[in-house]
A protein has these predicted regions:
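Conserved catalytic core of the tyrosine transesterase superfamily
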Residues: 1-191
Length: 191
């Protein structure tokens, strides 16, 4: 039964992380009562900073979650958590990391962690906006909220991991660039 649950759970939880930018602990701690499979909305409660927020699922992710839920309801009809092990308890971070490594290493030689899916979510959204000509300033607030950040400052972290993003942002935002990405003071520099 372990392999059956793993083969059902791994594709769903990793696609959920990839498509929503959820923190890994948010996915692991997701209670069934916080997943609305009719409306396609996940309520994130009691997470980092206790910042409750909502995530709207893409139609394809919603369909996958509905199918997964039907199968899991046959095995664990009264489960508390959305993703559970054979003992009907939520998976832990070690399970998630080990399974991510197995899958990732089978198709990639570079190093990555499950949490990198969150980083990828932010980077892909930022790149898509700039390529499609969206107003960056309007979109960053939405991204920040959907990722559960309390402030835009938390979301700005992702700029440092997107090559050449500062020049793209300067071209896109001109007069607001200094507000979005302030100059680093000498005492704040990292060596």
């Amino acid at each position: 039964i372990d392999m059956k649950i793993r083969s059902m759970t791994a594709p769903v939880i990793f696609r959920l992380l990839y498509s929503t930018g959820m923190r890994t602990i948010e996915a692991l701690s997701l209670r069934c009562e916080h997943v609305d499979l009719t409306e396609g909305v996940i309520s994130i409660v009691g997470t980092k900073g206790y910042n409750e927020h909502y995530i709207v699922l893409h139609d394809s992710m919603l369909e996958l979650m509905q199918q997964f839920n039907q199968k899991m309801d046959c095995i664990f009809p009264d489960r508390e958590y959305f993703f559970v092990s054979r003992d009907n308890v939520r998976f832990n971070s070690s399970w998630l990391s080990a399974n991510f490594r197995i899958i990732w290493d089978s198709v990639n030689s570079s190093h990555a962690t499950a949490y990198d899916l969150r980083h990828n979510y932010a980077i892909e959204n930022i790149n898509r906006w700039t390529n499609e000509g969206f107003n960056f300033y309007d979109k960053i607030a939405y991204l920040s909220k959907s990722m559960g950040h309390v402030t835009l400052e938390s979301t700005k972290y992702y700029y440092s991991i997107v090559p050449n993003l500062s020049s793209i942002m300067m071209n896109q935002t001109n007069e607001t660039f200094d507000w979005i990405v302030p100059e680093v003071n000498t005492d704040e520099e990292i060596y």
